[in-house]
Amino acid sequence: MQNYFELLGLEQIYNIDLKILEKQYFAMQIKYHPDKAKNLQEKEQNLIIASNLNKAYSTLKDSLKRAEYMLLLYGVNLNDEKVRSKLSALELSIFWDEMELIENTSSYKSLEEIKSKYELMEKAEVNFLAESFKKQDLSDATIKTSKLKYIHTLLSKLQEKMKLCK
């Protein structure tokens, strides 16, 4: 499998310009559209390339997926128990407390306030991640990615809860 950054002609950095990513993606989709193929073999190749472009785009446009993918490129597997245990017991306890808070909150307005707080935390964590990758501090990038994953989980839970409260 080709490196997603290379496939889309992008520099392998965390803090990518999403407008350039989108521009590159659409340009490549046009170039390798299966309907533009001259024969069956080329059409099959273009289908594979188009599929890889879709995977690359969906991975790189999402801050969490991009971080996980970059760590994977550096040989860090977040599913490894040693890697997952890098978050402190206190951080995990806070996460579970926040999950419980969401579960027990029934006011839509309160949920919106919690959501705003986590959206700010998400932005901050993405900025910290960009710095960690820039310094190639994989240990810190791993911890920041784990935190970002927990924030995404909380935001997802909030979205579900907010739908029920409407």
UniProtKB/Swiss-Prot annotation:
Domain J: 3-73
Entries under CDD domains matching the protein: DnaJ (cd06257)
MF-aspect GO terms: ATPase activator activity; protein-folding chaperone binding
One protein family per Pfam: DnaJ
Keywords annotated in UniProt: Chaperone
InterPro entries: DnaJ_domain, HscB, HscB_C_sf, HscB_oligo_C, J_dom_sf
GO terms under biological process: [2Fe-2S] cluster assembly; protein complex oligomerization; protein folding
HAMAP family: HscB
Binding partners and assembly: Interacts with HscA and stimulates its ATPase activity.
Recorded family membership: Belongs to the HscB family.
Function: Co-chaperone involved in the maturation of iron-sulfur cluster-containing proteins. Seems to help targeting proteins to be folded toward HscA.
PANTHER family named among the record's database cross-references: IRON-SULFUR CLUSTER CO-CHAPERONE PROTEIN HSCB
Name of protein: Co-chaperone protein HscB homolog
Organism: Rickettsia bellii (strain OSU 85-389)
Lineage: Bacteria, Pseudomonadati, Pseudomonadota, Alphaproteobacteria, Rickettsiales
